[in-house]
Swiss-Prot record:
This is CTP synthase. CTPSs have evolved a hybrid strategy for distinguishing between UTP and CTP. The overlapping regions of the product feedback inhibitory and substrate sites recognize a common feature in both compounds, the triphosphate moiety. To differentiate isosteric substrate and product pyrimidine rings, an additional pocket far from the expected kinase/ligase catalytic site, specifically recognizes the cytosine and ribose portions of the product inhibitor. Mg(2+) binds at residues 72, 140. The gene is pyrG. CTP binds at residues 14, 147-149, 187-192, 223.
């Protein structure tokens, strides 16, 4: 089987939406029966985004196999059925790290290590490895054409077009076509200059995606085609739109998928976008709306919670409800009190690291529990719910996590290596143990408790969800907490780690150690988010009565 490559680049300005455009095109090609995957090549020097600030980079998306990746991989999984893996995302830092490790081992036999050919060869090897077994591979190059950081990647894909053959490679370039109100027209010159920049590197784009706040007129598209040496039918207008889930249909209506299939000589049926039409219909025809408060520490940049925000919207689709998300800084709860939580139909506390704002999250969990407001805690959101319950219900005054107070009297949350077994002996788990070291990352099996609310929502006994955390519930204090009324609703494969807790005497109070947002999609939703939004709607109705 021959693999075909579509290389996606961006020009003029950043944040044009390369990831969404690539994912939307992939969705159309998948709907034509093709086996499609998407890769993201990031030009920054960090080895991966795992230790980058969420307020700079946005969220870290975790794949099934435990890779900490760019948030664009979340878009990819929400648009296509293919599961992403560590092969779908790599950075300049990762490439240089691998090449330097080989050099230290002597793999290059004393050769002088250079960007060309050693770095570019490593990039090409990664692309080919990531695309194995697929009909079409879309490869998104991060950054903007003209950035010095992107040059090795652009040179690598130029070489791939020569080596793989132009009949199996296609360059798709996103560019800005701004509208000038004073002139009353769109301007094509930035696009021409962006293409000129690409040509200077040796890349002739085959498809131009013209981003604008309005439809680019046919005469302007013809002008772009002529000056940029691109067929007129390959100049696609992609205007700003109120829903990203309308983009597959918008691209298909302009024949982009037909053009690509003909270019690659792929004989496949017409795309059936009925699933996406259903998503758009559900989004456009809600039966009501709910307001959900998300209490976090990175609210200045909503992209830090991108998958959570999207998953809440998916939960709304499944319940035909518009979800209005109110982002609340947990430090505001600390300084202004629970007044900032008024008029919410539900409260969600997402994951996070560090002590700043934790007490505000604990106050929020307390407010939700005492006022019967639907609550969903994710990762740290589960840990703060546990701390709150231990303090105020189980009689464990000052209960905390050793992440924040290492010597606290009641460490209800602790590092794996800090646990003691029932005999009082320290239980040590290192990298060779079945459940890894102090960081659990990636898909893990979870067994749901019979008769629990989550067992009812999932409709399955065993599930697999993705984790990214260092701290866990301390089993030594668990019995006292359970005796006070908290139910353990999910356990790890070896039955040693608490994965889900819930309150049986609360209308809807669920907290999980894993990140369910990473597996939610617009077409299928996710049981926890669908149930959470449904509970928010029910709470709203009770308040009206």
């Amino acid at each position: 089987m021959t693999t075909n490559y579509i290389f996606v680049t961006g020009g003029v300005v950043s944040s044009l939406g390369k990831g969404i455009a690539a994912a939307s095109l992939a969705a159309i090609l998948e709907a034509r029966g093709l086996n499609v995957t998407i890769m993201k090549l990031d030009p920054y020097i960090n080895v991966d985004p795992g230790t980058m600030s969420p307020t700079q980079h946005g969220e870290v998306f975790v794949t099934e196999d435990g890779a900490e990746t760019d948030l664009d991989l979340g878009h990819y999984e929400r648009f296509i059925r293919t599961k992403m893996s560590r092969r779908n995302n790599f950075t300049t830092g990762r490439i240089y790290s691998d090449v330097l490790r080989k050099e230290r081992r002597g793999d290059y036999l004393g050769a002088t290590i250079q960007v060309i050919p050693h770095i570019t060869n490593a990039i090409k090897e990664r692309i080919i490895e990531g695309g194995e077994g697929h009909d079409v591979v879309l490869v998104e190059i991060g950054g903007t054409v003209g950035d010095i950081e992107s040059l090795p990647f652009l040179e690598a894909i130029r070489q791939m077009a020569v080596q793989v053959g132009r009949e199996h490679t296609l360059f798709m370039h996103l560019t800005l076509v701004p509208y000038l109100a004073a002139a009353g027209e769109v301007k094509t010159k930035p696009t021409q200059h962006s293409v000129k920049e690409l040509l200077s590197i040796g890349i002739q784009p085959d498809v131009l995606i013209c981003r604008s706040d309005r439809t680019v007129p046919a005469n302007e598209r013809a002008k772009i085609a002529l000056f940029c040496n691109v067929p007129e039918k390959a100049v696609i207008s992609l205007k700003d739109i109120d829903s990203i889930y309308k983009i597959p249909a918008l691209l298909k209506s302009q024949g982009l998928d037909d053009y690509i299939c003909k270019r690659f000589s792929l004989n496949c049926p017409e795309a059936n976008l009925s699933e996406w039409e259903q998503v758009v219909y559900e989004e456009a025809n809600p039966g009501g709306e709910v307001t959900i408060g998300m209490v976090g520490k990175y609210v200045a940049l909503p992209d830090a919670y991108k998958s959570v925000i999207e998953a809440l919207k998916h939960g709304g689709l499944k319940n035909r409800l518009t979800v209005n998300i109110k982002l609340i800084d947990s430090q505001d709860v600390e300084t202004r009190g629970v007044e900032v939580l008024k008029d919410l139909d539900a409260i969600l506390i997402p994951g996070g690291f560090g002590y700043r704002g934790v007490e505000g999250k604990i106050m929020s969990a307390n407010y939700a529990r005492e006022n019967n407001i639907p609550y969903l805690g994710i990762c740290l959101g589960m840990q703060v719910a546990l701390m709150e319950f231990a303090r105020n219900v189980a009689g464990m005054e000052g209960a905390n996590s050793t992440e924040f107070v290492p010597d606290c009297k009641y460490p209800v949350v602790a590092l794996i290596t800090e646990w003691r077994d029932e005999n009082g002996d320290v239980e040590v788990r290192d990298e060779a143990s079945d459940l890894g070291g102090t960081m659990r990352v990636g898909g893990q099996q979870c067994h749901l408790t019979e008769g629990s609310l989550v067992r009812q929502m999932y409709g399955e006994q065993t599930i697999i969800e993705r984790h990214r955390h260092r701290y866990e519930v301390n089993n030594m204090l668990l019995k006292q907490i359970e005796a006070a009324g908290l139910r353990v609703a999910g356990l790890s494969a070896d039955r040693k780690l608490v994965e889900i807790v819930e309150l049986p005497d609360h209308p809807w109070f669920v907290a999980c150690q894993f990140h369910p947002e990473f597996t939610s999609t617009p077409r299928d939703g996710h049981p926890l988010f669908a149930g959470f939004v449904k509970a928010a709607g029910a709470y709203q109705k009770r308040q009206v009565k």
